[in-house]
Swiss-Prot record:
The keyword Repeat applies. Gene3D superfamilies: Ankyrin repeat-containing domain (1.25.40.20). This is Putative ankyrin repeat protein RBE_0585. SUPFAM superfamilies: Ankyrin repeat. ANK repeats lie at residues 42-107, 126-149.
Length: 164
């Protein structure tokens, strides 16, 4: 596998952050190995970063290019966990609601593409789960979606029975 030059990797992460799907797509087309590149800091993938920034268009591009939605970073966080991180914990209710709506839209995309939504099995280094992160971020629609998803998959009932 060819090593991706640092400047190209950095451009890719910049395009994800700035929500520039066309530029990212072109860069990936010229550098297919870029899809698996990780950030130098915490080893996030482009897919994780797209989830963190709630950039659904970029998430779709990355999935179409075979990004691995189950990768984890150095902290044990997966892409679903990244959906619920809010950079600014002092957001106004309107901003929180917008964050919640975008996160749910991405969760629905995952469900449509049969990407497992591991709400309380995917734990990070602190033993937090996506469901805990969504609650911590005060994202009620995301919590409701995940609980409904678990119920649909009969995972909630099995988990509760197993826990007893």
């Amino acid at each position: 596998m060819t090593k991706i030059p640092d400047n190209i990797r950095q451009d890719a992460f910049k395009y994800v952050m700035e929500n520039k799907p066309n530029e990212l797509f072109e860069l990936i087309a010229m550098n297919p190995g870029l899809i698996n590149e990780r950030s130098q800091g915490n080893q996030d993938t482009l897919f994780m970063r797209a989830c963190r920034y709630l950039h659904k268009d970029i998430i779709e591009i990355l999935l179409n290019e075979q990004a691995n939605p189950t990768d984890i970073n150095n902290h044990g966080n997966n892409a679903i966990m990244c959906l619920f991180y809010r950079e600014d914990q002092h957001k106004k209710p309107k901003d929180i609601n917008e964050h919640d709506e975008k996160a749910v839209a991405i969760l629905k995309l995952f469900e449509e593409k049969n990407i497992p939504i591991n709400c309380f099995t995917g734990q990070d280094a602190d033993k937090d789960t996506p469901l805990i992160e969504a609650a911590r971020a005060a994202l009620p629609q995301s919590i409701s979606f995940m609980l409904d998803y678990l119920e649909k998959k009969s995972l909630l009932r099995r988990s509760i029975i197993t826990y007893k």
